[in-house]
Structure formats: structure tokens, C-alpha cells
Design a protein with these regions (language model features):
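N-terminal nucleophile
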Residues: 1-146
């Protein structure tokens, strides 16, 4: 149950505001595994003053979330740039290439920043563990093991 998961919680929070979260941001991402398959999800509160009809990065497969048999990822940040480079897909492709989750997250964010110059964060879960990376203030991450 949740008591077991909570007992294995690792908090990787960095760049938090005094309230424990970044002001005016409420995106939540999750990646999970049942031991055989991976699933990823990302939810966002949207963007103020967006153009009518804009489709953000969150609902786009490969951008806000992505999974293969090797693992999954969820990302948030500069939405148009995340969509342009399909950040979550990029992170999972690194897992497919055989590198670990933390290295996949680090490499994906390094490539993202090099290509776009923008800020983002990504969480990654693979068969060997979890990782996260970001290049912007206000990203909080936690890992729960059952």
C-alpha cells in the first residue's frame, strides 16, 4: 500500500520557492512500472495567454510523455521547444540505447538546452532505476519504491 511506497520515498527537490513549489506552476508528471510494462503521464494547468487552438507539449506523445519496453519519461518546461525536440522520446531513446535512467535524463536535458536554449525538466524510469534532470528553477522530483 501507500505506507510501503512512502517508506521508500527519495526526495530530489531543488530550486523550490518558500512554499515548497514553484510559483504559478502546477504540472505533474509520473512514470511507473508494474515490473513488466511502463506507463507515463503528464498533467498541466495550461498556459496563460495562449493562442486559441494551441496544443501544448503535454498531450503530444513523445513530448510530454513517452514509453517503450525499455522505460518511460515525462517532461515539462518550455512547451513549444519540448514539442519541437520531443524531449520525452529523446530521453527514452537513450534508455533504448542501453544507458541508465539518470544518464538518459542528463543527456536529454543537455541536448535539449543545446538545441533550444530553453528550460525544461524530465523524469525517467528504466529497468535499472529512475533519474531526473532539469535546467530551470522550481523542479521538484520524488521517487517512490514499493
Amino acid at each position: 500500500g501507500s505506507d510501503q511506497a512512502g517508506s521508500g520515498l527519495e526526495n530530489g527537490s531543488q530550486g523550490e520557492s518558500d512554499s515548497g513549489r514553484a510559483p504559478d506552476h502546477d504540472t505533474v508528471g509520473a512514470v511507473a512500472s508494474d515490473g513488466e510494462r511502463f506507463a507515463a503521464a503528464t498533467s498541466t494547468g495550461g498556459r496563460s495567454f495562449a493562442l486559441a487552438g494551441r496544443v501544448g507539449d503535454v498531450p503530444q506523445v513523445g513530448s510530454g510523455f513517452f514509453c517503450t519496453e525499455a522505460g518511460g519519461a515525462s517532461a515539462t518546461g518550455a512547451g513549444e521547444d519540448i514539442a519541437r525536440v520531443t524531449l520525452s522520446r529523446r530521453a527514452v531513446e537513450h534508455l533504448d540505447d542501453g544507458i541508465g535512467a539518470q544518464a538518459a535524463a542528463d543527456r536529454a536535458i543537455e541536448e535539449f538546452e543545446e538545441i533550444t536554449g530553453s528550460g525544461a525538466g524530465v523524469i525517467v524510469l528504466g529497468e535499472e532505476g529512475a533519474g531526473s534532470a532539469f535546467n530551470t528553477d522550481g523542479m521538484q522530483t520524488s521517487i517512490a519504491y514499493k
